[in-house]
Every structure is written in C-alpha cells, then in structure tokens.
Amino acid sequence: MEHVITKHVLNHLESNSLLYDLQHGFRHSRSCETQLLSFVQELAANSDKNIQTDLIIMDFAKAFDKVPHQRLLCKLKFYGIKNQTLTWISAFLSNRTQTVVLDGESSDIAPVTSGVPQGTVLGPVLFLVYINDLSEYMKSSQLRLFADDSIIYKTIKSQKDCDSLQEDLDAAARWESDWLMAFHPDKCSVLTITNKKNPVKHNYLLHNHTLESVSSAKYLGITLQSDWKWTQPES
C-alpha cells in the first residue's frame, strides 16, 4: 500500500507542477546527474562571462528527523493531498513509538511526533513536500535542492548583490524558525567562484555566526573550486 500511496502523491505533485523546479531529489526523470549538469552549466556560463558567483552551502541538522508531523499534514493538505490518502499518511506517521535504553533500563514508550520514516519509499517524498516552500522565501537568489542538500547562490557584481544574498540567507533562517527545522551554522560555508583578481568580498552571517569561506566544496560527489575548476572523485 505504501508504494501505491507514494506513486499517487508523486503523480499528483508532478502533474500539477507543485514541486520546486530546482529540486532534483527523489523525483521522476531527475537525479544527481541532472542536478549537476544544469548547475555546472550555469556556473560555467557565469565564469565564461567573468561574473562572480557566491554560493552558500547549507547544512541541515537532522533534517529528516525534525519534520513535525502535524505541520507536514497541513502542507500535504495545502498541496491537495486529502481524504483517504491524507488519512492513510497520518496513520503511517502516527503509528510509531520510541523508547530510550540506558544501562539496561528502558524508558516508557512514547509516540514519535516528528521525523519522516527513513528506510521507507514514502518518507523521502514527504520530506520534499515539507521543504518545498523554502524556495518561496528567496527574493533574488537561486536555491538548488537535492533532497536536503541545499545551496543558495547569486551572481555578484557589487556589495548590493551581497546584501541581497544575505537577505535571502536571513529569509532561510526565518523559514527554519517558521517550520521548526534547523541549520548548522558552523557546518554551512561560503564558496566564491570567480576568475577575478579582486572579487567582491562579504562576510555572510547565519544566526549572527560568520560563515566560513572555503576555497573548495563538495557537492553531490564532485568538488567545486573557487577558481572554477571542478573534479570528480576517483572511482
């Protein structure tokens, strides 16, 4: 039954173009390769035009485990998942319990009220639904998503562009607060891709934490470098 529900939900989302277009995770005809192809082409085009691109590589804290069930159900309903399908998903989420074992002693059994079940086919699709509206918080920057792997980025020509990117980073922090998710500021980083000798520099902040600037960053199996070289891992 889970496979039937998953297929129904995905078909509904895809046929009505409800999923964010730059989300390539767990979707029909999309993959890690399709994400990398379009992203690398975009970055290469900017580099060819000698345009700087600043990337904010985000890091979710326990992304799949933190999704609140009731808020997820509200989002599913908003996207048109209702009636028997919504009832089944509610039962799928709620019929789960947890207990803590310490030194051989077990705590009382408690219901699990957050998290999409991992190791299931439906869980990842539910996660896509939950983070789908993160893109709506962006005003001038682009957002790339592959499940929870996320990058906020923008072409930079002046400090004003940096300020705009910072505003969208602040907006991501508001989304995080609104929907009870969490980013790891100390694990997020900034990669500036440019061939310019004097690039536009900016200290980006998340929760008043200055994000680390790096010269290279791994993304979906490749390493992006600030001078626009990129390498694949050795097989």
Give the ranges of each region predicted by the language model.
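Catalytic palm subdomain of template-directed nucleic-acid polymerases
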Residues: 62-79, 150-174
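Basic, alpha-helical interaction scaffolds
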Residues: 139, 209-235
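Conserved pre-catalytic core of RNA-dependent polymerases
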Residues: 1-117
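Short, conserved catalytic/metal-binding micro-motifs enriched in Asp/Glu and His
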Residues: 5, 59, 76, 89, ...
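Hydrophobic alpha-helical membrane-association signature
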Residues: 39, 126-130, 165-168
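Short, conserved micro-motifs composed of acidic
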Residues: 167, 182-216
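Active-site palm subdomain of RNA-directed nucleic acid polymerases
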Residues: 5-23, 48, 124-153
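Short, charged alpha-helical motifs in flexible N/C-terminal segments and linkers
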Residues: 44-52, 173-192, 218
